[in-house]
């Protein structure tokens, strides 16, 4: 009986652990993005903010996107969890990113990346790594095989290129 319960629990855990591609999240322009389109791709998921000391990383994220877009898909998630450093609306954030950094990688609507109202995607990332964002511009590298690696804010996106 214990073996059956363990096997059943493991089965449901494994089913839940693989649900990244079930997410549907709105982009900054309001269009829904189905994460199933990212199956088989290496992803770099980043929580962003417009008024942070790390905000210049947008330029490096864009550079990495331009150089490695055939190998790596960057997904940006604005969040106002740390110091109120992302106060803008989705429209204001989109304008800021385009005007100041020429961002062309996929940006999503503003979400919460930690706390009681943490978005399910970030709960999934936390469950996979045991790590959650400690500040803006934390990064998760998600490989096609399902492995996920966490990088702190101070790690420049260019430093992650060797991992892809």
What is the meaning of each model-derived region?
Residues 22-42, 63-68:
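A short beta-strand-turn-helix
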Residues 22-24, 91-136:
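Short, internal strand/loop/helix patches
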Residues 123, 127-164:
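Thiol-/selenol-based redox modules, centered on thioredoxin-like
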Residues 27, 47-51:
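Amphipathic alpha-helical repeat scaffolds
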Residues 3-13:
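Sec-dependent N-terminal signal peptides
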Residues 41-42, 51, 56-80, 97-101:
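Conserved helix-turn-beta segment immediately C-terminal to the redox Cys motif
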């Amino acid at each position: 009986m214990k073996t059956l319960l363990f096997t059943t629990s493991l089965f449901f855990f494994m089913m839940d652990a693989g649900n990244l591609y079930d997410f549907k999240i709105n982009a900054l322009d309001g269009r829904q993005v189905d994460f199933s389109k990212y199956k088989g791709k290496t992803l770099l998921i980043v929580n962003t903010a417009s008024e942070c000391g790390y905000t210049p990383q947008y330029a490096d994220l864009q550079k990495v996107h331009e150089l490695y877009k055939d190998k790596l898909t960057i997904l940006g998630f604005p969040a106002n969890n740390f110091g109120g450093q992302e106060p803008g609306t989705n429209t204001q954030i989109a304008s800021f990113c385009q005007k100041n950094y020429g961002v062309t990688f996929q940006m999503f609507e503003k979400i919460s990346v930690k706390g009681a109202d943490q978005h399910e995607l970030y709960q999934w990332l936390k469950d996979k790594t045991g790590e959650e964002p400690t500040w803006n511009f934390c990064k998760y590298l998600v490989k096609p095989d399902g492995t996920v690696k966490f990088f702190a804010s101070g790690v420049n996106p260019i430093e992650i290129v060797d991992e892809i």
